[in-house]
Structure formats: C-alpha cells, structure tokens
Amino acid sequence: MPIRILPPILANQIAAGEVVERPSSVVKELVENSLDAGADRVEIDIDKGGAKLIRIRDNGSGVAKDELVLALSRHATSKVATLDDLEGINSLGFRGEALASISSVSRLTFTSRTAEQSEAWQAQAEGREMSVTIKPAAHPVGTTVEVVDLFFNTPARRKFMRSEKTEFAHIDELVRRIALSRFDVTLILRHNGKVVRQYKAANTVAEQERRLAAVCGSPFMHYALAVESEHSDVRLWGWLATPEGARPQNDLQYTYVNGRMMRDKLINHAIRQAYDELLPADRFAAYVLYIELDPRQVDVNVHPAKHEVRFHQARLIHDFIFQALFTALRQQGAASDEPLAETLVELPVSAPIEYPGQAPRAEWYGAEHNYRAPAREVREGSSTGRAGNYQPPEPPSREAMRGMGSLLTTLPAVQGTPLAEAETAPVAAAVPAKAGAWRALTLVEQAYLLLERDNRLALLSLVRAERLLLRHWLLETWGQGLAAQPLLLPVSFKLPKNLVALVEQQDRLLKRMGLELKSGGRDTMILTRVPALLRQTDLVRLLPELLQLIESGSDSDAGQQAEVLCQWLVEQGISREKVYDFATANRLLTELVADFSDQLANVRMVRPLALASVLAEFADGH
C-alpha cells in the first residue's frame, strides 16, 4: 500500500481515539475550553448518559465569526503560539485538537458570540473533508457546544460504551473534580432534563468549605485537616483526612497541579508514604490537594488526556509533598474532633531553590543541619550559648574587594608546627581563642571563607569546618539515631550471603544510621530509607562498603564503632567538592566559634595569608 495523506475526517477520527474515550472525555474537553475562555458560569446538559446529547453552555469571551472555521480545524488554538508558550503553559487546553476530533465522531454545532459582535454565529463541520458552514444564530455573549449522537459514524467505538447509568456516573465524577478545581465558577449539571448537581461560585472560605462538603461529604469534613506549605516557588495547600477518616476505597482522592486535574504516580506515591504506617492495607487516604509551581517547572504535554505531568524537579516535588503531609499528620497526632483544624506546616529547609534547572541542595531533603552540640547554656535557656561576642559580618568595602585577589596567596603547610611557631607568627598570634573579632569578608571559590582581623587575613576551609562540626554532632546524638527519609525509588542490590546475614544481625545499628533495608529474596536487599546526608550519594556502591566496614569492626567496643561510623558518614555526606553560599559559610563560622574556637589555631582549618610580600611590592612601587 503506498504512503498517502489521510483525509481530514479519518485523521480527526484517529486523533479522537486518544482524546475522546467516552462521553465524559467530551465533557472534560469542552468545559476546559469554557474555563480557558474566562467563563464563571458553565451549564452542562446530558441526555442518555451523553450518547444522545452533550451540551455545554458558558458565559465566556466567545469566539469571533472569522475564527469559527479555525476553531473546528485541527491544530488551531489561541492558547499557544511559540515553543516558549508551550513550555510555560497556563491554560487547560493547548493542542487545538479537541473540537476537530469531537466533530469527526459526532454531529457537533458550535454557537458563539463575542462582546464586540451584535449577533451570534453558528458553525458546523460536515462531510468527508470536514468543511465548515457558518450561519447566524441567536445567542448571548459566550459559547454553546452541542454534541449529538456521539460515535454515530464509528460503530466499533459506540459498541464499547457502557450503560447510560455508568457513563453518566463518569460525567458526574468529572464535574465533581472540576467543582473542586475552580471554586470561583458556578457549575450546573443536568441529566435528562433534571438538575443533578448545582455548585454556586464560592469566593469566601466558608463558601469553599460548603462546596467541599457538598462534593466530599460530611464525614470527610469531620476528619479534614487544612494544610498549607510553601518552599521557594512551590506551594501545597488543601485538605486531607486524618487516618481515622480513611475510606474502604480510593474514591476521595483529588489532586490538582496549577489548577489541572491530575492522577500522577509520583504525587500518589508521596502521599502514600506520608501516611505510611498510619493506615492498614485495606484502607485508603482521603484528600483534596493543590500544588502550585512555576509552569516552566512542569511538562503537561506528556499524556493525551493531560492526566499526568512530568516535573523537572521530580525528587524535590515528591519530597516536598511527603514532608508537608508527613509533618501535618504527625503534628495532628490523634484525630481531632474539630473539623478543619488548620495546620500551617513550615518545612525546616535551607536556602531557597532557584528556578529553572538548579538541582536541589542535598540539605533540602530533611531538616537543616545544625551541627552545634546541645550546649549546657543553651539547654538552660540561654539565647546566646557560647557564641560570645561574635557579630554578624558586614560586607567588605570596594577597596578591600579590589585588593583581595592579590592577597590570596597562602603559606605552605607546616607539618607538625603549631600556628604560633609558623613563619607568620604575627598573623597567627592574631587568631584569638574567641573569634568575636574575626569578620567574614567573602567566599573564595565557594569553598573557603576569607576572614579579617586587625587588617590581617586568613582563609577558613569550609569543608573541614563542616566535617568537624558534623562529626561532633553525630557523636553527641548517636544514641538518638538519624532520621530516615523514604527514597523516591527504592534501591535494590545483591550481596554475598555473609553481608545479607550481617544486615539482619545489625538491623538496629543500621536504623540508628537512618538506613532501612528489607529482603528482596535470594541474596537481594532493598534499601527503602536513608538519612539526608546520604541522599545524593551512590548508594549501590556505598552500602556494601559500609557493611564491610561494620563487619571488620565487629570486635570493637561501642564507642570505637560509633567513631568509625560517624567518620564514614561525614566523609560520604560532605564531598570535598561541595560548594557553599555566604549564609551557610557564616553559620559554620558561628558554630565553629561557639564550640571549637581552639580549632581556629589549627593550620589545617585556618590558614593565615602572607601579606608582607604584597605590601612590600606596594611600598616599592610608591
């Protein structure tokens, strides 16, 4: 058979195979068009479950007469014009296929009027070439689309339609979902001439809660927690039922991304993990959740019906949802008798993530590390602890910044020689036991902090400082253990039999390190949870290495074992190539001053800079 261009009606019917699955698919596409047109009132009339008639009437902006032919053509849309528009899409529709596809498998009439027109116009596509005829009509500002005899010309598709009751149940559920996505829109649903659903526009919190109750029912409202959390450009809000409000089926699970109805595996996985052990296997969570983020951070053009999306920062979104819901559920504790007991969740995260394209910092995946040991003064209520006289740094002057490039020449390392005995004794002597006088000037190569005191400069190694603080913090809190965080995708790997047995023997120790493993059968282990420190590491390589380390130190006492394992965590968790921002560097300096001021006299931690030769050059040059 030779290659040929398909006739328009056949091409549209093929496209309809993806877009028009059943009558509810038609309702979805047409109502989304109404919402994109700015309608705040949409009426939906259904006859015979949608097989006989689907009529959508709205008060949106309408379509001009000279655009009606295009409206029924394939790949014609007013919603995107360039690739940039597609990458940051805000509308519900964008492909320009729906009307052409629907008209190819039904008898469709499209009647519309804009505010600028004195009369309305009606369009209808007919025949093999799908030619559009236009005639005047009576209609207020807005649009009405009538779809009659769905699948009349595709008997095979019509044969797969279910009963009238089943098809209308799908439409009813769709309208309920739309009602929760747009509280500001009045929705009326009729079936065979009778009003089945009527949702008035809800513009206040009380009205929104009434609509929520109308859609989800009173039992859901009784157990509902209002939750809201925000991190950088990502916001999560909505309602979720406590475990006591769980249901025997998953019929009350609504999620929306930027106002778009969604059934996304990643989102569902994060929600299930948040409930984790709170629900038995035969119970399902109930929730209505809204995720709002930069449209450029989500790709909606990955599913024919737009039910799924692809997040550019998938792990960030997954862990953000998990952390927000996990925190809300644990804060709530037992079920509250008060409906809608609002829980404002503030995630303990580090510096905001910058969009687009920047990978999240490793610290984001859990509580921000505070490596200070719980000092006695702090436990007793002191607000300053041992930080002493340390003052927040002031930014360096322009004159100081100009000279820094020529000043950053460090002395060679002096093996075994105390800093006070080094060649730069005057500078070393200036390093105080209390570093309150030290002033942080700027970052150098995002790995060192330039310090100044009495016109003398020194460099602080931020990696060494953080490793020291982290090691001390881990040892101090070893008995409490590290918090385990679920992996987006569990990691499985094969182990020799002796290490499989070791995992079972050392289960308690591994959990103390924030690692949870379970058997995958026949020499296979599955890693399901890790501490935040190891989130961004090569887990398949590190876990066997860790198990061998534990095995080799099995004869050591508990204290020695803790020191070895804490050092291992530090080395794996803080890479030598780690980069820092100024705020993090300054925090590390504050904690170093408070707990390890003696380390400021260690040339491995702080190196003085040789200024004498530079100053001499300036002097010689007058």
UniProtKB/Swiss-Prot annotation:
InterPro entries: DNA_mismatch_repair_CS, DNA_mismatch_repair_MutL, DNA_mismatch_S5_2-like, HATPase_C_sf, MutL/Mlh/PMS, MutL/Mlh/Pms-like, MutL_C, MutL_C_dimsub
Keyword DNA damage: yes
Family annotation (PROSITE patterns): DNA_MISMATCH_REPAIR_1
Entry superkingdom: Bacteria
Signal peptide start and end residues: none
One annotated GO biological process: mismatch repair
Keywords: DNA damage, DNA repair
A Pfam family this chain is assigned to: MutL_C
Job description of the protein: This protein is involved in the repair of mismatches in DNA. It is required for dam-dependent methyl-directed DNA mismatch repair. May act as a 'molecular matchmaker', a protein that promotes the formation of a stable complex between two or more DNA-binding proteins in an ATP-dependent manner without itself being part of a final effector complex.
NCBIfam families the record matches: mutl, PRK00095.1-1
Descriptive protein name: DNA mismatch repair protein MutL
Protein species of origin: Aeromonas hydrophila subsp. hydrophila (strain ATCC 7966 / DSM 30187 / BCRC 13018 / CCUG 14551 / JCM 1027 / KCTC 2358 / NCIMB 9240 / NCTC 8049)
Gene name of the record: mutL
